[in-house]
């Protein structure tokens, strides 16, 4: 039977960090706290651990919400690594995620990943799929077999807006995604990694799973170059079992994505199919 991931109650961590997704801000890299955080942890946080298995048929298994899925992995709610549900399953796994999609390079990134059988989650900002062009891009990503996640409507810092506005940021994007592809997102990634008590309640009501990350660098000026980005993503101390890699819909990430994915494989990591990661919504629909 499928196993659902419950959202843990957790303590608040305040950290004034810089925007990972806003290119006008300067940024520095920090390690994600390994505490049970549902609050402020910016997109410049870094840290890792892991678990999972690669499935060459990830395109088929991730496309249908109603399709029965045998979950073998879960998101660690404290440190956001990907961990096996059973001891015998592969622990040396890594998850690829792309935030701020679909901006200008999402389709190119997706096509490159698909060409090397590398699954990923594309985290969607609702503001990008209000237009017909944005909706068509989202459909293409979904039709290529990629998991679609919710990254809020306007990339607002949830800790700086009202509970009503937080609900709008999450629910509106869920509705836009569902209207476009007929599937509700299973994973939510808060802008800047800043979760709140209110967002936790909404995510629970929506049967979703919080998914921050363990490390990422592509918003920092020093790594806005394909070679530099590839090097740090493959050689950082935070690359460990269950690594949850944060990247963005950016030109340098587009240029580096194949080398990053292939480099992870060369280091012995299995690129996990997000369809194998547990969520309460998908488990209920499969029963």
Give the positions of each predicted feature:
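C-terminal motif of bacterial Sec signal peptides marking the signal peptidase cleavage site
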Residues: 16-20
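Short, well-ordered alpha-helical microsegments
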Residues: 105-107, 195-199, 253-255
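N-terminal pre-catalytic segment of deacetylase/amide-hydrolase enzymes
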Residues: 6-11, 21-96, 102-111, 115, ...
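Catalytic grooves of carbohydrate-active enzymes
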Residues: 238-252, 256-275
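Metal-dependent polysaccharide deacetylase catalytic core of the NodB/CE4 family, i.e.
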Residues: 92-94, 114-229, 233, 239-245
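Short, glycine/acidic-enriched loop or turn micro-motifs at the edges of active sites
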Residues: 102-103, 154, 251
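N-terminal secretory signal peptides that target proteins for export/translocation
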Residues: 1-2
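Histidine/acidic-residue-rich catalytic or RNA/ligand-binding cores of hydrolases
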Residues: 224, 257-258, 285-286
């Amino acid at each position: 039977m499928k196993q659902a991931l419950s959202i843990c109650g957790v303590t608040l961590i305040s950290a004034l960090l810089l925007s990972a997704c806003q290119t006008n801000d300067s940024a520095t890299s920090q390690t994600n706290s390994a505490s049970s955080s549902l609050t402020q942890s910016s997109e410049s946080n870094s840290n890792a651990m892991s678990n999972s298995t690669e499935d060459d048929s990830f395109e088929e298994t991730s496309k249908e919400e109603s399709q029965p899925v045998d979950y073998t992995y879960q998101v660690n709610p404290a440190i956001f690594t990907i961990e096996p549900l059973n001891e015998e399953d592969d622990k040396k796994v890594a998850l690829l995620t792309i935030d701020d999609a679909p901006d200008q390079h999402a389709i190119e990134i997706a096509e490159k990943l698909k060409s090397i059988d590398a699954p990923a989650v594309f985290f969607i900002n609702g503001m990008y799929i209000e237009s017909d062009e944005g909706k068509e891009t989202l459909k293409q990503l979904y039709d290529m077999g990629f998991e679609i996640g919710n990254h809020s409507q306007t990339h607002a810092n949830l800790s700086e807006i009202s509970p009503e506005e937080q609900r709008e940021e999450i629910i509106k994007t869920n509705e836009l995604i569902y209207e476009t592809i007929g599937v509700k997102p299973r994973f939510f990634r808060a802008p800047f990694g800043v979760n709140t008590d209110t967002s936790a309640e909404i995510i629970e009501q929506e049967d979703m799973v919080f998914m921050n990350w363990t490390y990422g660098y592509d918003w920092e000026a020093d790594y806005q170059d394909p070679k530099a980005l590839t090097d740090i993503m493959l050689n950082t101390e935070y690359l460990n079992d269950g690594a949850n890699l944060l990247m963005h819909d950016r030109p340098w990430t587009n240029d580096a994505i194949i080398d990053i994915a292939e480099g992870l494989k060369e280091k012995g990591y299995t690129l996990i199919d997000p369809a194998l990661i547990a969520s309460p919504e998908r488990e209920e629909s499969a029963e």
